[in-house]
Amino acid sequence: MDSEERRFKLLDTLLDYSKGTLWWVHNRLWKEQFAGFVWKKNSDFHPGLSICRRDVEGIYNTVPMLLGTSKRLHGRHVLSVRHMSPEWSSHHDRPSYFSVLRPCPLRLDYFGRKDTITQNVTKPRLESDEMRVLDKMLSGKEV
C-alpha cells in the first residue's frame, strides 16, 4: 500500500465529508474554481457546504461543495446558515448563504489540511431544519 492510498484510508476513516457537513475552504481553492471569485485581503477562508451523496473512492476523487458567502443571496433556492463562526467572532450571528447555482468539486486530498480545507469545529454539520431546506434545494423544489 503506497502513501497516497494510506492517506486516503485515513481521511476516509477520520473525516465525515457527507452531505450537510460544513467546512472552511481556503480562498485559493475557490479562486481556482470560480473566475469571478473576489478574494478579500482580510479573509483567507470562506465556508463550504458538502453536498456529497456517495462515498469517495480514492484520494483524487472530488467532494462537491457549495460556496458560502456573507452577501445576502435572493431567490428560491438559497440556504441561510447561522452560527458558523465562534461566539467571540463578529460573524457569529451573521448568516452564511449557500446557493445550488455554483457547486464546486474539491479533491479529497485537500481535506484535513489547515492551509486548504478544515472542518468547521464550531458547527460541523447542518441542523435538521437546515438539512430539510438543503434537501429541497438539491431536489429543485422551492425553499
Task: Give short role names for the model-derived ranges.
Residues 1-5, 76-143:
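C-terminal terminal-subdomain/extension
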Residues 37-89:
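Compact nucleic-acid interaction/catalytic patches
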Residues 1-42:
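GIY-YIG nuclease catalytic motif and its immediate N-terminal context
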Residues 19-21, 61, 96:
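A generic secondary-structure signal marking the coil-to-beta-strand transition
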